[in-house]
């Protein structure tokens, strides 16, 4: 071996020692029961793209919107915990039967603005993280729904107009509140809503203007009452074993992606309601923005027991969250 060969071999050896090992490419399928055009879908697209770019292509996330992967939101929590799904974007009120803490953002009339919804999320985030941790999961970010109202085939502006209306709610909180107020409310997954509207199984829906716009509710309904019931959260969570298998750089990339998605989702609230209302009215929906205070009072009173029932289930943590939130809002 001559001196050139010796130096070349030595240089190659040094380069191999100095070069970091390339991270193995991770391919994840990400479930989401809602449409790609929703706030949650658009934030998820940002999340997947940023994760890919920040990881140098070593994190490859394929989004499955509209429940197309075969899981509804109510099934996501257990599926991610068990590893059947590596990651999901989930409407958390629908899994409150498993972990009651997740009902928090759906409590009736607790928040009245985007800033209050953000404050509640900031206060409660450590508690959410703890719940995910004890269920073999990592919480990555939350995306908010705009305020929920009642979509129906008529103006819902009083107890009389609500009485007997078959209204879908997404969780136990909404179901209880509407039933107490006189509606024939039932809890139903999002994927089942449009088929039930089409068949006459329901004739009203408690959801945001955003949700109904994305699902083109004007094909079945005529009115939206902006009662501002709640601003519930979707959360993106990943199986802890899958997360732990990532390299340090990949986990950092995932954190960067989660922040980008969070910024996208919360930032969209500033203009989304006005955009939704304009599209709804262009498609023939009567938007009732000034809902009578008497009706709002009825709904608020009807939802009072939801708070006491929730606090019985979550105990001191719930009291601490509500106290901190009310002190900061």
Feature locations, PLM:
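N-terminal secretory signal peptides that target proteins for export/translocation
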Residues: 1-2
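N-terminal secretory/targeting leader peptides
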Residues: 5-8, 24-116, 124-125, 131-329
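Cleavable N-terminal signal peptides
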Residues: 10-11, 21
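Hydrophobic alpha-helical targeting segments used for export or membrane insertion
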Residues: 12-16
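Sec/Tat signal peptide C-region and signal peptidase I cleavage site
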Residues: 17-23
